[in-house]
């Protein structure tokens, strides 16, 4: 049976290639759709996800949406609360995080994002454009320990 993904406006949907193999191979690939993690992640970014990884506050995680569990989303784990994780998008204006659906149970957190790859934009072939892309295309996704400070400011 094939995993299907739905669309929720403003929600970064992930189309994953290896979620089912996560139990055998702890690394998988995913693709971001949606604006809620801008400026950290953009629509079209490819992610390397470690399934079953230990999550700490500030980590970017892949999770099942609490109300639509066939939809995978990517958010930042802001803090652990009673009943699971409080997750937030890096783009405060996009919504679609724990401010909408509350605490996410631990069993819905699938893995931690370690690395992102940004595909080369079509039509940009000048040497300067290619050089800029080469320098920024692949980056580690770092934990942001200041997410808890952002949480207190809300």
Where are each of the predicted segments found?
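Extended hydrophobic leader/signal-anchor segments used for secretion and membrane insertion
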Residues: 1-154
């Amino acid at each position: 049976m094939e995993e299907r993904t739905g669309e929720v406006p403003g929600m970064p949907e992930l189309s994953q290639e290896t979620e089912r193999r996560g139990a055998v191979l702890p690394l998988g690939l995913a693709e971001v759709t949606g604006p809620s993690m801008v400026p950290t992640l953009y629509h079209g970014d490819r992610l390397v996800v470690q399934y079953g990884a230990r999550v700490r506050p500030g980590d970017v995680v892949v999770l099942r949406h609490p109300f639509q569990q066939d939809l995978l989303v990517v958010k930042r784990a802001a803090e652990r609360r009673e009943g699971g994780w409080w997750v937030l998008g890096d783009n405060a204006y996009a919504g679609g995080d724990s401010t909408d659906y509350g605490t996410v149970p631990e069993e819905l957190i699938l893995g931690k994002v370690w690395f992102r790859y940004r595909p080369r934009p079509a039509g940009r072939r000048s040497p300067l454009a290619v050089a800029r892309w080469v320098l920024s295309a692949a980056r580690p996704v770092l934990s942001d320990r200041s997410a808890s400070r952002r949480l207190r400011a809300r």
